């Protein structure tokens, strides 16, 4: 047994390397800060220049006997181990030392970091722990989400993400061990823009139905001048942005791929429209590989390029991001082959995401999934996917996916379960086989207090509903078409109970904000002809404002959304707009 503190006093000190960088120093300071909060004991933070003592918590690669070997770790892996009375928290890179400190606080000392403002810090003046030897390593080298609150400065490392979000200054300025992109997607026009080139060089852009088009075009990827312009600008971008690890060369966010004879020939030879794309991106990537060996060139397997080419493999320094945008998200991705509205009209019959992922897995050295975890047309509508998150992340791992971007509502605080979903995603990116039910219960208890029980029952009610009726939903689903009217009284009863059980005003605010999802469903079933429509609408708008929700539809100014609510013109008001 290790006696870390006794009655608020401790013989331990925290040791870091003499030449520790900002993140390593910050890890040691955070550890001291939280141990003080837990026990009241102030542990000194020193460097390994001092002679060793028996009772030390060593953070980072300190010069001490017993230091674990991390040379075989990858993907920000780290080791937490006790050696007699000494504790080691050490990762295979600088950032993973910080992960080790936070994991020790969570897994050994019992802290929980639910959101940036909601934590559980146990109170123990006397703190004893059993000997331990733990190794943690994510199966994914890149882990990122856009859920609001998960990426706030200083919080994302507590959740183990490593996308290049804003970082608190005291975590260190170096971003060499995070995935920082230059251009995150739809970037081809950053290199060859039709506004600059089309008038003099229409041949640089897509031929569609026999003519070159400027509006909503793509690049002609077999044009040698387009390739040379792109290679030159790519090299300059890498020189100008040494802080970036990944440089995007990805199609624009629409169709209209080039049908010129040469592009058509290559795509036919490759059996997929990704043929021209991968050959083009490979040529760009190979042009910079010798000079910039640590740089990755990112591209998409998205919509018309989602199918893998039959002949050409992505170069070793090319990262392919396959996007699941067409899929159903109420069933495990491994099991459901249905394409959802509106993509059902543009999806090739017989072509499935599952097969495309497997095909890319066989040929790509770096395979990232861009996955979708919210309803982008209705941020306030329930996204009934909590029960499939683990299945999906296991599916990605089992298909040799090397990175995950789990896109959510990144524009506003959630009126649904954004905080819970972001928390679960962060845990699953490190432990796909972990205990999701335990994590869910811990989060609900920490975030909603005594109201956790009925809220948990509500989550299970929705999951059971979609399973019982085999309901499918994509990322633009209408809540009117998706959830049955008979469910609403049961929903309301559970949220009434949750509000009645709320511990205090702060908890009540969280409960009422999360209840907006049910109120939105009920409102969406009304029409301007209903007697109480105006009153219900204005009260809902007032409460949306009061709870700090600033977007309820992706990319649309909330005042425009409110006007649509008032006039009964929200998208999906007519069930004919949706297929399910």
Where are these regions (language model features)?
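Feature activates predominantly on carbohydrate-active enzymes
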Residues: 7-11, 15, 19-22, 26-30, ...
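Acidic, His- and aromatic-enriched active-site or binding-groove loops in soluble protein domains
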Residues: 267-287, 314-334, 396, 424-434
């Amino acid at each position: 047994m290790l006696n870390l503190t006794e009655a608020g006093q401790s013989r331990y000190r925290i040791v870091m390397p003499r030449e520790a960088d900002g993140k390593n120093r910050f890890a040691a300071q955070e550890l001291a800060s939280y141990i003080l909060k837990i026990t009241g004991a102030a542990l000194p933070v020193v460097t390994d220049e001092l002679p060793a003592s028996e009772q030390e918590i060593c953070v980072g690669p300190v010069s001490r006997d017993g230091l674990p070997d991390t040379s075989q770790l990858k993907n920000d892996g780290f080791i937490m181990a006790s050696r007699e009375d000494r504790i080691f928290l050490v990762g295979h890179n600088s950032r993973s030392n910080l992960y080790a400190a936070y994991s020790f606080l969570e897994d050994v000392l019992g802290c929980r970091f639910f959101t940036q403002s909601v934590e559980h810090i146990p109170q123990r003046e006397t703190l004893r722990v059993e000997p331990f030897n733990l190794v943690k390593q994510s199966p994914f080298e890149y882990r990122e989400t856009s859920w609001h609150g998960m990426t706030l400065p200083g919080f994302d490392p507590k959740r183990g993400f490593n996308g290049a979000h804003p970082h608190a200054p005291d975590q260190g300025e170096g971003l060499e061990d995070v995935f920082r992109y230059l251009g995150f997607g739809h970037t081809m026009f950053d290199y060859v823009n039709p506004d600059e080139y089309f008038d003099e060089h229409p041949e640089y852009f897509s031929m569609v139905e026999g003519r070159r088009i400027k509006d909503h075009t793509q690049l002609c990827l077999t044009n040698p001048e387009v390739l040379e312009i792109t290679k030159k600008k790519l090299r300059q971008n890498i020189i100008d942005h040494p802080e970036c690890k990944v440089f995007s060369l990805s199609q624009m966010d629409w169709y209209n791929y080039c049908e010129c004879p040469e592009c058509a020939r290559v795509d036919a030879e490759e059996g997929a429209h990704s043929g021209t794309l991968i050959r083009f991106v490979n040529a760009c990537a190979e042009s910079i590989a010798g000079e910039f060996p640590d740089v990755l060139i990112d591209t998409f397997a998205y919509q018309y390029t989602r199918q893998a080419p039959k002949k050409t493999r992505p170069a070793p320094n090319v990262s392919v991001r396959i996007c699941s945008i067409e899929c159903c998200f109420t069933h495990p991705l491994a099991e459901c082959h249905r394409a959802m509205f509106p993509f059902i009209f543009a999806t090739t019959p017989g072509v499935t995401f599952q097969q495309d992922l497997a095909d890319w897995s066989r040929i790509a050295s770096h395979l990232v999934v861009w996955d979708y975890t919210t309803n982008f047309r209705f941020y306030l509508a329930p996204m009934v996917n909590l029960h499939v998150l683990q299945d999906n992340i296991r599916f990605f791992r089992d298909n040799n996916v090397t990175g995950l971007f789990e896109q959510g509502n990144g524009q506003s605080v959630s009126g649904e379960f954004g905080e819970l979903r972001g928390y679960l995603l962060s845990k699953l990116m490190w432990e796909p086989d972990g205990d999701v039910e335990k994590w869910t219960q811990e989060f609900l208890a920490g975030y909603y207090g005594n109201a956790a029980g009925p809220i948990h029952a509500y989550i299970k009610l929705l999951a059971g509903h979609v399973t019982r009726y085999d309901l499918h939903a994509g990322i633009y689903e209408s809540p009117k078409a998706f959830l049955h009217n008979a469910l609403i009284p049961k929903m309301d009863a559970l949220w009434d109970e949750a509000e009645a059980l709320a511990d205090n005003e702060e908890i009540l605010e969280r409960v009422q904000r999360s209840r907006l999802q049910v109120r939105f469903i009920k409102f969406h079933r009304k029409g301007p002809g209903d007697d109480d429509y105006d009153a219900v609408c204005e009260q809902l708008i007032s409460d949306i404002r009061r709870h700090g929700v600033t977007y309820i539809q992706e990319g649309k100014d909330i005042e425009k959304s409110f006007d649509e609510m008032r006039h009964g013109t929200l998208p999906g008001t007519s069930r004919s707009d949706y297929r399910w």
